[in-house]
Amino acid sequence: MKTKVFSHEFNEVFISEGVNFFDERGQFKKAIYGKKVLEMMGSVNELLCIKSNKNVIRGLHFQDPPEAISKFITCIEGKVLDVFLDIRKNSNTYGKYGSKVLEDSDNKGLFIPEGFAHGYSVLSDSATVVYLQSGDYSPEHDGSINPLSLDIDWKVEKPI
């Protein structure tokens, strides 16, 4: 497995390249390996699996300190546009966002550190996204930003 920095601008966000194997039995996708998970996230407290329909936009979600969380995301069915927004006020990239298409046919995963809001739009008829989170859900620290309030091209025709 290889990991690489998403871009020079967002040098804390990483793209992971794992294994995606197809044969007559179906598909095997390994997006990240154990030691790398611990290096990136420190711990894994939650595993989320979310299935959504075409044109759905989920997000932009985050948790404030001291319950901020990092995430590792991959798509196991369909195709999504995954978006991350820097909400760290003292960051050079504060208020800027990046995006990456993730789909079931690739071997990619995306690591998003604490201090970023996260969301995605569904580009295929349906999509299933799986992600690991470094902390537990904390309603008192939970926050969201309306994804349509920002100038982000979600690549969907009729957002749901």
Language model features by range: what are they?
Residues 1-105, 126, 133-160:
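Non-catalytic, conserved peripheral segments adjacent to functional cores
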Residues 102-125:
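Conserved metal-binding segment of the jelly-roll/cupin
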